[in-house]
């Protein structure tokens, strides 16, 4: 039976939406609920295709730190929670997905545009001055050498191994069985549950009820959000410039292709 509402009962709601490029907006909310509101539980609503490796790991670690303080964290997957977003989800106490949620995509991708042929056609050439053999690895102005390909593959392989190890540990999946689940393929929520990648199936309201129950709260406990940090026009413009810069430079990502 549902407990009666106790005045002051609250649960924190944190939303992770879109590509994961900057961890700070999400981590700021997590810290707020830990240090200011001191809530007993956080519902982490995820609708993201993944993103940068470092950013995903930053949020993953912050969720771990939140749980170490005794706060329950329930990950609720929306339309998509794949790759880096799945990495974040496995840090939670439990994961709930919709049957049709697109999740999984456990793997790493690094893409390097190559424009040397086009540049030659328009008569544009670059003089490169660098400090070491590999400093311009991934440059779009020339083809990639074989040793550079091997170097970058080693970076991708190690990053993938970190992801794989985290999944195996968090989901208690034997390494042998991980092979078939971590080739970058996507799964529906229902498939993911059958494979042990998520715990239960349900929507946002189901996850909210579960979070309240896990924290020992009544069904009427209030859902609260952290105050948003308003950015100035200059900060927003600077953020747009940074996004363009990241888009034009190479990075290793946990994301859908």
Task: Report the location of each language-model feature.
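N-terminal organellar transit peptides
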Residues: 1-81, 94-98, 111-257
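Short, conserved acidic/polar surface loops in the N-terminal third of protein domains
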Residues: 55-56, 85-88, 107-108
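Short gly/pro/ser/thr-enriched loop/turn and capping motifs at secondary-structure boundaries
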Residues: 80-83, 102-106
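Hydrophobic/aromatic residues within transmembrane alpha-helices
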Residues: 88-89, 192
């Amino acid at each position: 039976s549902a407990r009666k509402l106790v005045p002051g009962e609250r649960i924190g709601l944190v939303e992770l939406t879109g590509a994961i490029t900057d961890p700070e907006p999400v981590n700021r909310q997590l810290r707020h609920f830990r240090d200011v509101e001191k809530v007993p539980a956080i519902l982490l609503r995820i609708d993201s295709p993944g993103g940068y490796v470092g950013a995903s790991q930053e949020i993953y670690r912050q969720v771990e730190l939140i749980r170490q303080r005794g706060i329950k964290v329930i990950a609720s997957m929306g339309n998509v929670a794949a790759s880096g977003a799945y990495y974040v989800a496995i840090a939670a106490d439990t994961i709930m997905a919709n049957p049709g949620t697109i999740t999984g995509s456990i793997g790493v991708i690094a893409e390097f545009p190559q424009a040397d042929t086009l540049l030659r056609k328009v008569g544009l050439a670059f003089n490169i001055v660098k400090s070491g053999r590999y400093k311009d690895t991934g440059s779009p102005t020339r083809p990639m050498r074989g040793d550079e390909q091997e170097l970058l593959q080693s970076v991708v392989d190690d990053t993938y191994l970190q992801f794989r190890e985290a999944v195996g540990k968090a989901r208690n999946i034997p390494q042998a069985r991980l092979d078939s689940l971590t080739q970058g393929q996507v799964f529906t929520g229902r498939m993911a549950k059958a494979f042990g990648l998520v715990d239960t199936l349900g929507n946002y309201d189901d996850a909210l009820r579960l979070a309240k129950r896990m924290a020992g709260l009544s069904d009427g406990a209030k859902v609260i959000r952290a105050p948003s940090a308003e950015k100035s026009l200059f900060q927003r413009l600077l953020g747009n410039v940074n996004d363009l810069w990241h888009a034009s430079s190479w990075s290793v990502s946990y994301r859908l292709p």
